[in-house]
Amino acid sequence: MKKHINIKFGELFLKGKNKKEFIKALFKNVNKALSDFEFKLLDKHSMFTLEYCSEDENEIIHILKMIPGIHHFFLCLEAKTDIKEIAKVANGFDKKYKTFKIEVKRRYKEFLDQTEIKKEVATYILKNNEIKVDVHNPELTINIEIYDENKSYVWFDKILGVGGLPIGVNGRCLSLLSGGIDSPVASFLLQKRGQQVDYLTFITDDVTEITLNKLKSLIKQITLNYKIYKPRFFIVDFTKVQHELIHMSNEKYRITLMRRSFYRIAQQLAIKYKMNSLICGDSLGQVASQTIESINTISQVCDKMEIFRPLLTFDKVEIIEIAKQIGTYEISISEHEDVCSMFAPKHPITKPKLSIALALENELELLKSLEDRAVANVQIIKE
């Protein structure tokens, strides 16, 4: 008895004329993501069917749950198109269930009709189990698909994927990766909307190899071990810019000016290396630099592209839950040096004014040239 997984697309069917291109991209991504296994992936228009070795099942399920574009999938058992064979396979459900119903789909019409199939299979199951039929609110739904004259499929449980769009259909963007909990989740959510995500981090002399390795581990986790695409990791030495920022006359604006500098540098890199937007992990009101006034003052420096903030309305509990689901949480909470926390004043401004931020930047004669030099000297790691 062979094992299959039927993969459903969800949102891709809303794409009209572009639907074929989106499905083609997802087909390619699934093949790449599973390249370490022996499998056969078939495009059956309304779904993909994956034939696989049973010993790889747990790992394959874990990967499929993380591939953007997959709405849900079923673990299917294959049976001959014979009603006795189908009934025996359908009887292989977990015996913990007390009620059930049967759903039937017939691609191959030259067989019993739906009512006859349901009656025969239900009779067999009721005879061999202590279970009742409940067509309105069953604990278990047994799905049967009569595929052709030779084979049929039976499945029991629907496994949810992450949904969204296939990676790569919406271009590339640049994520400002700090190593905390939020920015990896924000990166994953933009990846889920079809973006290939490249990563940018800022370091100073205090940042160690341990921190850089932590960031690389986060990127590897988000991108499914680099199977679907190879992200670029941009590392900017921020030391000299940070030393210049220390000379401002109002230290309460230190984080505001530092983040404005981050975004100026990020925008330059995104333009130079052909990315279409920036990503950050801001959550409205979470810290001083994420009040609406701070966000407005900081964002003003990005006049050539959008800054996406997918976590803007999420609270910390929600963000942590997603981080755990995608496997970044345990990596994020390990110790690391963070440029922002090391540079933060005791009492940062929570409602900065743009006019004051601009005036403070005008005090720093070397700021622009140091930012330009940081861009020119960026280190790029390609996995």
Curated annotation (Swiss-Prot):
<keyword id="KW-0808">Transferase</keyword>
<dbReference type="GO" id="GO:0002937">
    <property type="term" value="P:tRNA 4-thiouridine biosynthesis"/>
</dbReference>
<feature type="binding site">
    <location>
        <position position="290"/>
    </location>
    <ligand>
        <name>ATP</name>
    </ligand>
</feature>
<keyword id="KW-0547">Nucleotide-binding</keyword>
<protein>
    <recommendedName>
        <fullName>Probable tRNA sulfurtransferase</fullName>
        <ecNumber>2.8.1.4</ecNumber>
    </recommendedName>
</protein>
<feature type="binding site">
    <location>
        <position position="259"/>
    </location>
    <ligand>
        <name>ATP</name>
    </ligand>
</feature>
<comment type="function">
    <text>Catalyzes the ATP-dependent transfer of a sulfur to tRNA to produce 4-thiouridine in position 8 of tRNAs, which functions as a near-UV photosensor. Also catalyzes the transfer of sulfur to the sulfur carrier protein ThiS, forming ThiS-thiocarboxylate. This is a step in the synthesis of thiazole, in the thiamine biosynthesis pathway. The sulfur is donated as persulfide by IscS.</text>
</comment>
<dbReference type="GO" id="GO:0140741">
    <property type="term" value="F:tRNA-uracil-4 sulfurtransferase activity"/>
</dbReference>
<dbReference type="Pfam" id="PF02568">
    <property type="entry name" value="ThiI"/>
</dbReference>
<dbReference type="InterPro" id="IPR054173">
    <property type="entry name" value="ThiI_fer"/>
</dbReference>
<dbReference type="GO" id="GO:0052837">
    <property type="term" value="P:thiazole biosynthetic process"/>
</dbReference>
<dbReference type="GO" id="GO:0005829">
    <property type="term" value="C:cytosol"/>
</dbReference>
<dbReference type="GO" id="GO:0000049">
    <property type="term" value="F:tRNA binding"/>
</dbReference>
<dbReference type="InterPro" id="IPR004114">
    <property type="entry name" value="THUMP_dom"/>
</dbReference>
<dbReference type="Pfam" id="PF02926">
    <property type="entry name" value="THUMP"/>
</dbReference>
<dbReference type="GO" id="GO:0004810">
    <property type="term" value="F:CCA tRNA nucleotidyltransferase activity"/>
</dbReference>
<dbReference type="Pfam" id="PF22025">
    <property type="entry name" value="ThiI_fer"/>
</dbReference>
<keyword id="KW-0067">ATP-binding</keyword>
<dbReference type="InterPro" id="IPR049961">
    <property type="entry name" value="ThiI_N"/>
</dbReference>
<dbReference type="InterPro" id="IPR003720">
    <property type="entry name" value="tRNA_STrfase"/>
</dbReference>
<keyword id="KW-0694">RNA-binding</keyword>
<feature type="binding site">
    <location>
        <position position="281"/>
    </location>
    <ligand>
        <name>ATP</name>
    </ligand>
</feature>
<dbReference type="GO" id="GO:0005524">
    <property type="term" value="F:ATP binding"/>
</dbReference>
<feature type="binding site">
    <location>
        <begin position="201"/>
        <end position="202"/>
    </location>
    <ligand>
        <name>ATP</name>
    </ligand>
</feature>
<dbReference type="InterPro" id="IPR049962">
    <property type="entry name" value="THUMP_ThiI"/>
</dbReference>
<feature type="domain" description="THUMP">
    <location>
        <begin position="58"/>
        <end position="158"/>
    </location>
</feature>
<dbReference type="InterPro" id="IPR050102">
    <property type="entry name" value="tRNA_sulfurtransferase_ThiI"/>
</dbReference>
<keyword id="KW-0784">Thiamine biosynthesis</keyword>
<feature type="binding site">
    <location>
        <begin position="176"/>
        <end position="177"/>
    </location>
    <ligand>
        <name>ATP</name>
    </ligand>
</feature>
<keyword id="KW-0820">tRNA-binding</keyword>
<comment type="pathway">
    <text>Cofactor biosynthesis; thiamine diphosphate biosynthesis.</text>
</comment>
<dbReference type="InterPro" id="IPR014729">
    <property type="entry name" value="Rossmann-like_a/b/a_fold"/>
</dbReference>
<dbReference type="GO" id="GO:0009229">
    <property type="term" value="P:thiamine diphosphate biosynthetic process"/>
</dbReference>
<dbReference type="InterPro" id="IPR020536">
    <property type="entry name" value="ThiI_AANH"/>
</dbReference>
<dbReference type="GO" id="GO:0009228">
    <property type="term" value="P:thiamine biosynthetic process"/>
</dbReference>
<keyword id="KW-0963">Cytoplasm</keyword>
<comment type="similarity">
    <text>Belongs to the ThiI family.</text>
</comment>
